[in-house]
Amino acid sequence: MSQVILDLQLACENHAGLPDEAQFQRWLDGVIPQFQEEAEVTIRLVDETESHDLNLTYRGKDKPTNVLSFPFEAPPGIEMPLLGDLIICRQVVEQEAQEQSKPLEAHWAHMVVHGSLHLLGYDHIDDDEAEEMESLETEIMLAMGYEDPYIAEKIAE
């Protein structure tokens, strides 16, 4: 049986309306056990200022972003279940959900799935990687009872 341990950190000023710890746990449980038996993940919910600072420092992008993934890399010869950290910006997630006419809960779930796949080594730098990652995201979201997060883009094509 797989086990995903969640460390949820609420670093944003307003906690009202945020998904609860059980929801974040369910979303992690929907993705990570498909790839590894044990994992520890920190999810830190932040405001735009912290997201902006981290995005600028680590990605060179001068704006806040929806989710940042920081995979843990253990020193050689040491095995630990620590998968890494997800930094999710509340305001960006809420704004994107509204702009994209997506249910807010579904967009939160998508950000956890998307970020978790980054922690597991997936990326979307080139078209083939993006297609593989988006396909996995869609499969996982559908399995958890949500719509395809890319349906609007697919319809537009």
UniProtKB/Swiss-Prot annotation:
Residue pairs linked by disulfide bridges in the UniProt entry: none
Binding positions (Zn(2+)): 114, 118, 124
Chief location of this protein within or outside the cell: cytoplasm
Compartments (UniProt record): Cytoplasm
GO BP terms, alphabetized: rRNA processing
Keywords carried by this UniProt record: Cytoplasm, Endonuclease, Hydrolase, Metal-binding, Nuclease, Ribosome biogenesis, rRNA processing, Zinc
GO molecular function, one term: RNA endonuclease activity
Any one GO CC term of the record: cytoplasm
SUPFAM superfamilies: Metalloproteases ('zincins'), catalytic domain
Manner of cofactor binding, per the entry note: Binds 1 zinc ion.
Matching PROSITE patterns: UPF0054 (PS01306)
Entry cofactors: Zn(2+)
InterPro entries associated with the record: MetalPrtase_cat_dom_sf_prd, YbeY, YbeY_CS
A Pfam match: YbeY
EC numbers on record: 3.1.-.-
Top-level EC class as recorded in UniProt: hydrolase
Family named by the database record: Belongs to the endoribonuclease YbeY family.
NCBIfam families: rRNA maturation RNase YbeY
Function comment: Single strand-specific metallo-endoribonuclease involved in late-stage 70S ribosome quality control and in maturation of the 3' terminus of the 16S rRNA.
PANTHER family: ENDORIBONUCLEASE YBEY, CHLOROPLASTIC
Protein name per its UniProtKB record: Endoribonuclease YbeY
Organism: Salmonella dublin (strain CT_02021853)
Chain's gene name: ybeY
